[in-house]
Amino acid sequence: MSEATDKQKQVSAETPLERDLKSKQQSIAATKRKQYRDDKSQIRKQARFEVSTTPEPEQSDSSATTATITELPKKRYYRQRAHSNPFSDHRLEYPKSPESMDWSNLYPKQYDISKVEIADIGCGYGGLMIKLGPQFPKSLILGLEIRVQVTQYVEDRIIALRKNQEIINDKKKKESGGGTGDGDDNDYSYQNIAVLRGNAMKFLPNFFVKGQLSKMFFCFPDPHFKQRKHKARIITNTLLSEYAYVLREGGVVYTITDVEDLHNWMVKHLDEHPLFERLSKEWEDQDKCVEIMYNATEEGQKVTRNKGSKWVACYKRLPSPDDCE
């Protein structure tokens, strides 16, 4: 109450000239952010449909030296609330069925629907995908994010990473007298990661067929502390049945949070579901994805800086009773 009173006093103490100056500064900052996002949006539209069907002519040495590194996007120009209501009407675009989904727009140079098998639900700023990508270069990884500005940030980040890595790879090939030409791991350029604005709580089966995914990540989801908000948590009995549907037998659900109450909630619901079985601590210690998940996300790095705790639980998808008959 006292803080609010102090704030009111501070505002009332401002002169009309100071208030006018402050308003102009805020307006200039907002205009600058919008212009930055509009510029990135134009780049995004062009890059999204760049599909090379024929080998490009070899660049001359002079053109290679003029290739410039694309600037990575800046978070301050993508302001967004920390969380979004999953039950709101966000006017999202989604396919009627997985068969009608055109994945080639997201993975223009590495498209194969059978390989879309890793999903980061609520991917945030994309840190996990960017670390997982090189570890699974033959698999397609999709991040689902409901917030508009955050999704645009990740799109722009992936576009910049792809362009920059291709420049680096071309330079390495020229220095080594030419590449192998067989598309080995040395040619990796983040073509297997992509982000999509979507609501996993509503439309996940619209994107994936039964048993398509091998891994699902739920990293630092919204805890929804209030009792009446618990129905909006990303792990519930109903949603777990949907996750089990799109997850193949033996697939893994990865969860991590810095909120112990949410961790206990997720563990309770996963333990009670007949199609999931918790993996041991020994398994977690040996799995490279757990290590990446623990340290790669922006939220996880913030928890580390604040010396907070991280709670991990991983579950294996069990065979369905019908499949055992």
From Swiss-Prot:
Pathway: tRNA modification; N(7)-methylguanine-tRNA biosynthesis. Its main location: nucleus. It is found in: Nucleus. The keyword DNA repair does not apply. Keywords: Methyltransferase, Nucleus, RNA-binding, S-adenosyl-L-methionine, Transferase, tRNA processing, tRNA-binding. Signal peptide: none annotated. S-adenosyl-L-methionine binds at residues 122, 145-146, 199-200, 219, 297-299. Residues 51-69 have a biased composition (Polar residues). Gene3D superfamilies: Vaccinia Virus protein VP39. It catalyses: guanosine(46) in tRNA + S-adenosyl-L-methionine = N(7)-methylguanosine(46) in tRNA + S-adenosyl-L-homocysteine. Catalyzes the formation of N(7)-methylguanine at position 46 (m7G46) in tRNA. This is tRNA (guanine-N(7)-)-methyltransferase. It comes from Candida albicans (strain SC5314 / ATCC MYA-2876). The gene is TRM8.
